[in-house]
Amino acid sequence: MRMKDLYAPTLKETPSDVETVSHEYLLRGGFIRKVAAGIYTYLPLGRRVLLKIENIVREEMNRIGAQEILMPILQPAELWKQSGRWDDYGPEMMKLKDRHERDFTLGPTHEEIVTDLVKNELRSYKQLPLTLYQIANKYRDEIRPRFGLLRAREFIMKDAYSFHASWESLDETYEQFKKAYSRIMERLGVRYMIIEAETGAIGGNASHEFVVPAKIGETNVLFCEKCGYQASDEKAEYKGEYTQEQEEEKPLKKVPTPGVKTIEEVSEFLGVPPSKIVKSLLYKGREGYVMVLIRGDLELNEAKLKAHLKDQSLRMATPEEILKDFGVPVGFIGPIGVDVKKVADHSVRGLKNFVVGGMEEDTHYVNANHPRDFKVDEWYDLRTVVEGDPCPVCGEPLKATKGIELGHIFKLGTKYSEAMKAYFMDENGEMKPFIMGCYGWGVSRTMAAVVEHFHDENGMIWPLSIAPYTVVVDILNMNDAEQKQVGEKIYQVLSEKGEEVVLDDREVSPGFKFKDADLIGFPIRINVGRSLKEGVVELKKRYSKELVKVNIKNGFGALLETLEKMKREYDPKEAVR
């Protein structure tokens, strides 16, 4: 490919709405263009990277016996209603009606479609296990699309689904996917973590995420340096002990707290620490209101709440709903005298004489005690684990980091097969629901994650495995006939040998070419310039300042050998150490 023909419009200036390095460099490097918030066009360079990522993923899927299919993006609501997720999935689901007023969704995932497909085709345990996958566009109506490709409304994903006659068979496939995903990460050349994760709206009873550490990552990871425990903050358990307070219970008293609503304000006004205040949070779900109680100095983990109550539709009640249904402004809600289901974090159990909302504007109760003053229906671990909390395995203080989730695997069990009546006949002639797993990989976000991992102040540093082109040949003076002739010859020789090579034959300055080469991130650059008078060309790795001079007076043998050596030694990790 010639640069003068390549559609790669680079930008000198950074677009104003850029929030991350990957977003900036992919826009400036001519890889993507924004159509609308969270929606992008992939230009030729971006498409080449995507295809290479897809091929790596496809090769690893085929290696473990998964079979590729392609399912429709447009999905009928009936299937989602069968599984119970039409209402549970939440506002991220893009819903629409056709001209006949029938409900559809632009698929955010395909469990319903694939379960419906298989239940009509597979009848016997002899046909199991079966794993199907696709690489296709997905849609989620993100409330705030951001970070470029990392949180988009339209994105490319590999989703796979496995069907089994036994849990043992699912376990085997699950481990195969763990190994396959690890190989994908290794082929990308990035550092990664495998962490325990929450199942969320997908469901199931076990889940792991494959995460690339990154400062701008939206996955919060807790890990233990001693025993190796790793989990997302949505999943991390708190198994530390809570103090059982021994003080005498004091008489309950309602006190005026004018305009005092937040934990900090209540703490200062009443002269009590936040740990002696209990937050009362009202949520709405399928079964109506539920009040959640947690110590004032802790944060509620919504993912744990939804998992424990088995209701992904749970959301915090709005101030308007609370005022209408309870007659109390937000900030003064409390558990005393309220007839709703109450669930509490274990941190509340050992408290004595604590503060709660007074269920009346500008009031709070002091010296509240459980179970004297109110009843808790269910107790759970609902707190968000943070850095410094004890490891649930060995008790050592946990460390925290951030990461970008690329892969997510789930043991679904019979969640979908039972709901959608997908059965097979086992060896005893009995009808049983399929035991399922599902396995996602974010293809388009992989591109952004790799850039976040491998870059410098000048641009992207692509690993060889997914670089749009491996080599760029820069003719530094297009008015020099010898440089043009030699540059063209090197380009021809490399092309004939199957190298993915670009010839920069534009009538621009050498500095302009160097800046574009660094911004785009070509792994290896060959300079054909002034040193050609001595029969020498220069080779340079993208992340290195060293120029390797190669004599070509007697042909291109030494050049080809040096290029192969550079490719063998090429390691973008050297740029981020």
From Swiss-Prot:
It comes from the Bacteria. It is an enzyme of class 6 (ligase). Pfam families: HGTP_anticodon, tRNA-synt_2b, tRNA_edit. InterPro entries: aa-tRNA-synt_IIb, aa-tRNA-synth_II, aa-tRNA-synth_II/BPL/LPL, Anticodon-bd, Anticodon-bd_dom_sf, Pro-tRNA-ligase_IIa, Pro-tRNA-synth_IIa_bac-type, Pro-tRNA-Synthase_IIa_type1. It is found in: Cytoplasm. Its main location: cytoplasm. Coiled coil: none annotated. One of its GO terms (biological process) is prolyl-tRNA aminoacylation. Catalyzes the attachment of proline to tRNA(Pro) in a two-step reaction: proline is first activated by ATP to form Pro-AMP and then transferred to the acceptor end of tRNA(Pro). As ProRS can inadvertently accommodate and process non-cognate amino acids such as alanine and cysteine, to avoid such errors it has two additional distinct editing activities against alanine. One activity is designated as 'pretransfer' editing and involves the tRNA(Pro)-independent hydrolysis of activated Ala-AMP. Consists of three domains: the N-terminal catalytic domain, the editing domain and the C-terminal anticodon-binding domain. NCBIfam families: PRK09194.1 (NF006625), proS_fam_II (TIGR00409). Homodimer. This is Proline--tRNA ligase. It comes from Thermotoga maritima (strain ATCC 43589 / DSM 3109 / JCM 10099 / NBRC 100826 / MSB8).
